[in-house]
């Protein structure tokens, strides 16, 4: 089989936009591990400046077409033609994946994309969370790297047990080097034990640790709450505990010592999995030593469809509590593929204009802004700013 193109992590998370949670069954995005580097400790009360954003080298259209052909099996000439008429490599990569998974032509997927978000496109293609996950696992197993240490059947077997492909391939490599079996090595990687630690346990040579002083997760922004923009830099314990209590409903007295032990991102992961699985925080903490986050979802019964439905319930509750948006409205539109923040903005603008959300929500496209939408429905720039400020205030952004 052709070598697998590295697909952005969010591609495997069907419900990206529902809750930007750490990982799912195929990948997403790569799940946050405890071994990730966080913000370096402050010196003299000050943190170093944020690092510049790293940009990928630009691909020529010919190079991009070759990658797409290799990843999905589409004709090189067709890929080059679509790139040459203005479609970006990023959009083409996503469109090819969705076309492959749905069985629809790439051109149809690109046409659906013009006025809509990718979440909406997935819904229009009939790619439910369950179907998306099943098809994506089959895709991963069919397009293994040329030097893959596992075959298609083995990869698919473990993918269906909640292990991400990267872990399966790494475990197979270490199993071969250590004389162990894949089944023995794969479960060794957990939330609290990364692959370098697994190597040490197996008596294998470890890679020299490199200093990554600016390896930030989310560039100092929150990554697990279904919206962007909440700054986690300079977070205080008091503020963090209030955020987690409001979002996940756990007791503040229980959250405080856990925040002091695990930090913001570590506790976010714990709260998210506990809330979605309806378990206690302590139960999830104990599972961290046994499973990776991806595998834990499988063990907890959080299939892609179940996880998505609970994400919908979660966001519907939050929008009802903070924005007075009826839960049935949020649930209806999230099931149609609209992201929570999209529903939020559309509903508030519609209210200001005396319209129904259905008359507003599709006016927002990938090529315009909510300010453009506001002006189109007879509102002013100030009206749009008021909506934006209300969302920021009620969700604690940029504090």
Predicted stretch roles:
Residues 18-19, 394:
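Residue-level signature of transmembrane alpha-helix interfaces in integral membrane proteins
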